Swiss-Prot record:
Species lineage: Eukaryota, Viridiplantae, Streptophyta, Embryophyta, Tracheophyta
Protein name in UniProt: Mitochondrial import receptor subunit TOM40-1
Pfam family, one: Porin_3
Protein function: Central component of the receptor complex responsible for the recognition and translocation of cytosolically synthesized mitochondrial preproteins. Together with TOM22 functions as the transit peptide receptor at the surface of the mitochondrion outer membrane and facilitates the movement of preproteins into the translocation pore. Directly involved in the pore formation.
Annotated organism of origin: Arabidopsis thaliana (Mouse-ear cress)
CC terms in the record's Gene Ontology section: cytosol; mitochondrial inner membrane; mitochondrial outer membrane; mitochondrion; plant-type vacuole; pore complex
Subunit structure: Forms part of the preprotein translocase complex of the outer mitochondrial membrane (TOM complex) which consists of at least 6 different proteins (TOM5, TOM6, TOM7, TOM20, TOM22/TOM9 and TOM40). Present in a large lipid-enriched complex called mitochondrial transmembrane lipoprotein (MTL) complex made of proteins located in the two mitochondrial membranes, including the TOM complex and the core components of the MICOS complex and containing at least digalactosyldiacylglycerol (DGDG). Binds to MIC60.
Signal peptide boundaries: none
Length: 309
C-alpha cells in the first residue's frame, strides 16, 4: 500500500517538519549557567597563552586526592607611562596545589611563593542546589577577596545568588524559551563603591552553531558566534563594545582537534595574533607551545611547557 501512495510534495514536507519541530513547553531543556553563556567562544578565542617556560606535574595519591607542582619562568609585564610601550621584568614562580575530587565535593588549593593562597570549593547539597566558594588571600592590604555562589538548577531554568566582600550582592536567572533559545538577566549591587547594574542576555544554539549576546548597564555589549564545521573543527568570532569608553574590539579564531593534539588561534582588531598548541606525546605527558604577536606594540610572546600527570 505504501508504494501506491503518491509522494509528498515540498509543501507537505515543510508542514510535516514544522509539526515535528513543535515546541513542547512542558519539556524544555535546562539552559547553560548564566556565566557560561559564551563558553564555546571563550574556548576558541581566550586560550591560555603564556610567555617563557611552564612545567606542571600532578601526582594522584588515590582516586580522590592528588598533589600538583607548577613552575613558571618568564618575563612579567609592568605598567608603563605610554600604552604603546611594554616593560618586562624577569620573574619565576613556584606553585603548590592540593586537590580533592568527589562526585559531590570539590576542593582545590594553591599556594604561591609570593604568599598568595587560592582556594576553591564546590559542594552539591542536593541534585539541584550547588554551593561554590572562591577565596584569595594575599599579604597586600585590602587585596584579599572572597565570593560565594548558590546555584539552583530547575528543569528548564537556572538561578544563581552571589555574595562577596565589600557588600557585593548579585543574582542571575536564565530560562529556556524554546529547545534552542534561552533568555536571561542579571542584577548586582556593590555597597562600598555604591554601584549597581543590570544586564540582559540571549543564547541560541543548534547542533552546528552557537550565538550569544549580552548587554549591561555598565555600557558593555558582547556578541559571540561559533560555527561547528565538524566534530573536530570550530570557527568563532566575537564583538565587544563599551558605550561609555567607546572601545571596540572584534576577533576571529579557530579550534582544531587532531588525534593527538589541539590547535587554537585568533587575530583581533588590535593587531594581536596568537596561537596555542597542545600535543599529547604519550599517556600523561602533554607538550604546550604558545605564541603571540602584537603588531601595534611591536611585541611578541613565546612560551613552551610540559604537563605531566
Amino acid at each position: 500500500m505504501a508504494d501506491l501512495l503518491p509522494p509528498l510534495t515540498a509543501a507537505q514536507v515543510d508542514a510535516k517538519t514544522k509539526v515535528d519541530e513543535k515546541v513542547d513547553y512542558s519539556n524544555l531543556p535546562s539552559p547553560v549557567p548564566y556565566e557560561e553563556l559564551h563558553r564555546e567562544a571563550l574556548m576558541s578565542l581566550k586560550s591560555d597563552n603564556f610567555e617563557g617556560l611552564r612545567f606542571d606535574f600532578t601526582r594522584a595519591l588515590n582516586q580522590k586526592f592528588s598533589l600538583s607542582h607548577s613552575v613558571m619562568m618568564g618575563p612579567t609585564e609592568v605598567p608603563a607611562q605610554s600604552p604603546e610601550t611594554t616593560i618586562k621584568i624577569p620573574t619565576a614562580h613556584y606553585e603548590f596545589g592540593a586537590n580533592y575530587y568527589d562526585p559531590k565535593l570539590l576542593l582545590i588549593g594553591r599556594v604561591m611563593t609570593d604568599g598568595r593562597l587560592n582556594a576553591r570549593l564546590k559542594a552539591d547539597l542536593t541534585d539541584k542546589l550547588v554551593v561554590k566558594a572562591n577565596a584569595l588571600i594575599t599579604n597586600e592590604e585590602h587585596m584579599s577577596q572572597a565570593m560565594f555562589n548558590f546555584d539552583y538548577m530547575g528543569s528548564d531554568y537556572r538561578a544563581q545568588l552571589q555574595l562577596g566582600q565589600s557588600a557585593l550582592i548579585g543574582a542571575t536567572y536564565i530560562q529556556s524559551v524554546t529547545n534552542h533559545l534561552s533568555l536571561g538577566g542579571e542584577i548586582f549591587w556593590a555597597g562600598v563603591p555604591r554601584k549597581s547594574g543590570i544586564g540582559y542576555a540571549a543564547r541560541y544554539e543548534t547542533d552546528k552553531m552557537v550565538a550569544s549576546g549580552q548587554v549591561a548597564s555598565t555600557g558593555a555589549v558582547v556578541m559571540n558566534y561559533v560555527q561547528k564545521i565538524s566534530d573536530k573543527v570550530s570557527l568563532a568570532t566575537d564583538f565587544m563594545y563599551n558605550y561609555f569608553s567607546r572601545d571596540v574590539t572584534a576577533s576571529v579564531g579557530y579550534d582544531y582537534m587532531l588525534r593527538q593534539a589541539r590547535v587554537r588561534g585568533k587575530i583581533d582588531s588590535n593587531g594581536v595574533a596568537s596561537a596555542l598548541l597542545e600535543e599529547r606525546l604519550s599517556m600523561g605527558l602533554n607538550f604546550l607551545l604558545s605564541a603571540e604577536l602584537d603588531h601595534k606594540k611591536k611585541d611578541y610572546k613565546f612560551g613552551f611547557g610540559l604537563t605531566v600527570g
